[in-house]
Amino acid sequence: MTISPRDEQNRSVDLWFAYKVPKLTKDTDSDSATGYEYVYYDREIGSVQKSPNRMNNPKGALFYTLDSIFGDPGSTTGWILYNDEMPADADRSNNATLGHTKGVIAFDIASNSALWLLHSWPKYTSPSAPGVPTPLYGQTFLCVSLDLETAGKIAAQMALHQQPQVYLPRTAGLDHASPLYTLTQPLNASAPGDSDSLDFKTRGGAPFKVIAKNRKWGKDFWNDLVGPTLKADMDVETWIRGKIPPILDSDGVHKTYDIKFIDLRKLGAPWAWPETQDHAKWGITTTDDWVCVGDINRMVTQEKRGGGTIAFQDPQLWKALSQTDLIVPPPGKTEAQARAMIHRTHQPAD
């Protein structure tokens, strides 16, 4: 059995991205939404498109991908599920000292294949009941293909830096010396993790970076690590419910702006919403076409949590997302007014 991301027609692809819409009531800025609609992108279709599917129905890339893993797994197929808020059937308490991380690593030993689904949805997912939790907020998903060696390198980084809260793993005969197996075991909370950037390629040869930090690093992930690593100014959308770090990056050159409004209407989808209705964790650089999809927020309190993002250059996806964020200002506002709004509402760290 070959493990790979599945697209909207249940075909194997190298990667896909999806942005789930929050639950919305119809107003002058947006159509109503149930909270399960989404836009979808992969490099085969080459553009971000409004999906005809919903995430609470047995169709679409997310459903097909997880069903290919959990539906009828062979003896050599396994998975590592992790989330900072676990589903009910995980039957364990959340551990706030572990990473603010959410995702799935699935693998098949016999076919030397794997995938990584990194997302922002709390309490998701479960092998026995891979349904969907709350529709209230916007969420992001990125799924990429891997081979076992690459999956192992990512697992080794995660064990040391992100330190995810793993639940309901299926090891499927993994060698106990494998980093994938190690990730399923209790993690060393005193591990001397710092920050890290790991380059990897998908099975299709597409280059990516995993940028990650350990909770002991003690700095803002986006401001002090991602922006300087990519050497660019950034616009970042995350869940903000508290004090925000400074706008100026630690390198004293680049800036990180917090997105205040998401507008999908230029992409042919009839939805727009403020960041207060968004739980996604993504960012784009203002130059060089970098896209980041992650699982950690830009808040001072998150400096004490591990987490990471997948960064990659994709001109089509970058162009689409750059049209949806604060650069397309809220209705009736210019770009300059949108930037000024960020400065006015900003709560810098003490």
Curated annotation (Swiss-Prot):
EC number(s) per entry: 3.1.-.-
CDD domains per record: PLDc_DNaseII_1, PLDc_DNaseII_2
A Pfam cross-reference name: DNase_II
InterPro entries: DNase_II
Record-level Gene Ontology MF annotations: deoxyribonuclease II activity
Domain of life: Bacteria
TM ranges: none
Keyword annotations: Endonuclease, Hydrolase, Nuclease
Keyword Nuclease appears in the UniProt entry: yes
Family that this chain belongs to: Belongs to the DNase II family.
Remarks, miscellaneous: Unlike their eukaryotic orthologs the putative Burkholderia deoxyribonuclease-2 are probably not secreted from the cell, as they do not have a signal sequence.
Protein name, UniProt field: Putative deoxyribonuclease-2
